[in-house]
Amino acid sequence: MPHVEIKCFPGRTEEQKIKCAEEVTKAIAGTMGCNESSVSVDIKEVAQDDWKDQVWDKEILPLENLYKKPGYTCE
């Protein structure tokens, strides 16, 4: 605990994904008061053509209480 799942378009290098996971781990541990060893991070790539159906419509749009909302829409 805690577990973070990041979804993004394809195209990031493995090095970028590792760096992202490291930085997210530091931020989570620092702000939530847990050890870095308690944090897990998963990065899933979603094709841009699938983003609206797989992510926006199912995981972003229905959530009224997102702590950070995106600055875009998929209308």
Which residues make up each language-model segment?
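A domain-level signal for the structural core that forms small-molecule/cofactor-binding pockets
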Residues: 2-75
